[in-house]
Amino acid sequence: MHNGFDALQLHANRLRGVTIPDLLAAELKRPEQYARQVGPLYFNFARQKYDCVALEALFALARNHNVAGAFQRMFCGEQVNVTEGRAVLHTALRGDLSGTSVAVAAYTAAAKVRERMYALIAGLDASEVTDIISVGIGGSDLGPRLVVDALRPISQGRFRVHFVSNVDGAAMRRTLDMLDPSRTAGILISKTFGTQETLLNGRILYDWLGGSERLYAVSANPERAAHAFDIVPTQVLPIWDWVGGRYSLWSAVGFPIALAIGSQRFEELLAGAAEFDAYALRVPLEENVAVLHGLTAVWNRNFLGCATYAVMAYDQRLALLPAYLQQLVMESLGKRVKCDGTPVDRDTVPVWWGGVGTDVQHSFFQALHQGTNIVPADFIGTIRNDDPYTENHFALNANLLAQIEVLANGQLSDDPHRVYPGGNPSTLILLDALTPQALGGLIAMYEHSVYVQSVIWGINAFDQFGVELGKHLAVQLLPALKGESVEVVDPVTRAVLVRLRG
């Protein structure tokens, strides 16, 4: 059998007419047997459309693809980013697990940079600065933005942090219009310091601040960062090429996080991720939540044929999580060739999307309940909420449970317009409370789930060449928009340029 895929297809065929209620009835201990607790995180896979026999075949697939060995290679600092010849050591930003010289050196370097970062924060604490503008895009923005928004209610930092990512000048103007330049500092975050959006927005911020005195930078090219904006080297924090942008919030890219929530809370975030790292590395495949989550995604994509995947955050503080995961998953797994350059032989990443409950129930849930597509989903909620509005929290979680149940079980009716077909599989994830530790562990779980999927599909989760061509073409077209004579080959682009130039 083809590395276990053929056996799994037989199981998918066997289960085609089986409903999720059928599975619950056949395996009476399923609600407990398909649940896992990892620190402050609870996972329940009981409403996924597989049984224990199919699940064992999924674990066999993981063994056939040596997922455990792949984890070891990544944590030890081997060059698992094969297309760029790089190690992948975001885990070393938050803990030292492998003990190899490469990983220890990475962990030590990251700790030293954090010390520098905290010293810069102490300097800002002693100043009159009240607001921070963080300029970055993609991995330099989505992770910090998510964490700052999620942990704002328990923040220990005294700074208000504002994020600007879009090259659209309206985004920067909206932020600047509400701030006082004399009480504002800026952080420019770019791995290469060649990102068009960050450079253009950075120039606006530089001019608005009246120079670089209160300007900071984070980059894997610190010399270019310092030179481009005349920033003193002591205000430039380094990152490394072994940290991908979408995995970088644990590094100095997290500077705005530490400013917003405080250094202690930032350390708790790292500790939560490190605890999950240790779990992912050491727990056997059959009990490992990251492995099970990744295998479930493969099952839904390749054997149930689901082309989209939804994330429902039933906590307003996690409203940005679907967008963050959209980048993490789709930029990592949106590949059509394997690591060796040959075409993949099955579908890879589905489209990830989602929203925040209960708002989503009044927008796209109609299509989930009565549309024609089966949409697997992760439902994420919190057990304890520290705000005083307890009735609201009860109502929120009642809706969370109700939607999961109806999407899976459906309901028959004599009126065809009122039939709920059900059949939508889901995973429930509950945080004991939305703490830095729990959020760090949750994000780390998704990182490792993505890696599991990449190993099964034989693709590189750590490059992103697909984003390059469009950026390159945009640079070529920019002079044409300004009226310069530029050869434009595409006839539609040529016609639209005439209209854009007026």
Swiss-Prot record:
Q: Which UniProt keywords apply?
A: Cytoplasm, Gluconeogenesis, Glycolysis, Isomerase
Q: In which pathway does it act?
A: Carbohydrate biosynthesis; gluconeogenesis; Carbohydrate degradation; glycolysis; D-glyceraldehyde 3-phosphate and glycerone phosphate from D-glucose: step 2/4
User: Looking at the keywords, is Zinc present?
Assistant: no
GO CC list = cytosol
Q: Which residues form a coiled coil?
A: none
Q: Which CDD domains does the UniProt entry name for this protein?
A: SIS_PGI_1, SIS_PGI_2
So what EC number does this one have?
5.3.1.9
**Compartments where found:** Cytoplasm
Q: Name one GO biological process term.
A: gluconeogenesis
Pfam families, alphabetized: PGI (PF00342)
Q: Can you provide one Gene Ontology molecular function annotated for this UniProt record?
A: glucose-6-phosphate isomerase activity
Q: Which reaction does it catalyse?
A: alpha-D-glucose 6-phosphate = beta-D-fructose 6-phosphate
Task: List, from the UniProt record, the residues annotated as the active site of this protein.
Answer: E331, H362, K471
InterPro entries xrefs: G6P_Isomerase, G6P_Isomerase_C, Phosphoglucose_isomerase_CS, SIS_dom_sf, SIS_PGI_1, SIS_PGI_2
Annotated disulfide bonds: none
Tell me the function of this protein.
Catalyzes the reversible isomerization of glucose-6-phosphate to fructose-6-phosphate.
Q: Would you identify the family this protein belongs to, as annotated?
A: Belongs to the GPI family.
The name on file for this protein is Glucose-6-phosphate isomerase
Gene that produces this protein: pgi
